[in-house]
Swiss-Prot record:
Pfam assignment, any one: Ribosomal_S8
GO CC terms in record: ribonucleoprotein complex; ribosome
Key words, A-Z: Ribonucleoprotein, Ribosomal protein, RNA-binding, rRNA-binding
Protein name: Small ribosomal subunit protein uS8
Quaternary state and interactors: Part of the 30S ribosomal subunit.
GO MF, one annotated term: structural constituent of ribosome
One GO biological process term: translation
């Protein structure tokens, strides 16, 4: 898959692979932000696992899918959200309250909006998954 934004391509590719029933997907090229988002997806139970593979170029991630993703995507442009403003973005990107996850980049790293709300910190909404 070619495009200008590897992050968006990674999420769209995983979404497409899940929708046709594939059990794995290769994300190329690898980046720190993609790795951090995959860690959040793993922690929230959306993927079975992932592994970084050094191919001598930019690297890649082998992602084990488990069929738990109905839809995922990048949020463009990146919206800033305070710790008390996540509900507005939940209404916009998620189908129901407490169903799905917004992925947020904060000064404490990449995390789900549930963790950010719990810690009382805001950040930029970069992706959603449900």
């Amino acid at each position: 898959m070619t495009g200008n934004d590897p992050f968006t391509n990674a999420l769209a590719g995983m979404d497409n692979a899940e929708s046709v029933g594939h059990l794995s997907y290769t994300v190329e090229p690898a980046s720190n932000i993609i790795g951090s988002v995959l860690e959040v997806l793993y922690d929230r139970g959306y993927v079975d696992g992932f592994e970084y593979v050094d191919d001598g170029k930019a690297g890649k991630f082998e992602v084990e899918l488990k069929g738990a993703i109905n839809e995922c995507g990048a949020v463009k442009p990146r919206y800033s959200a305070g710790a008390d403003e996540f509900e507005k973005w939940e209404k916009r990107y998620l189908p129901a309250r407490d169903y799905g996850t917004l992925i947020v980049t904060t000064s404490h790293g990449v995390m789900s909006h549930y963790e950010a709300r719990e810690e009382g910190i805001g950040g930029q909404v970069i992706a959603y998954v449900y």
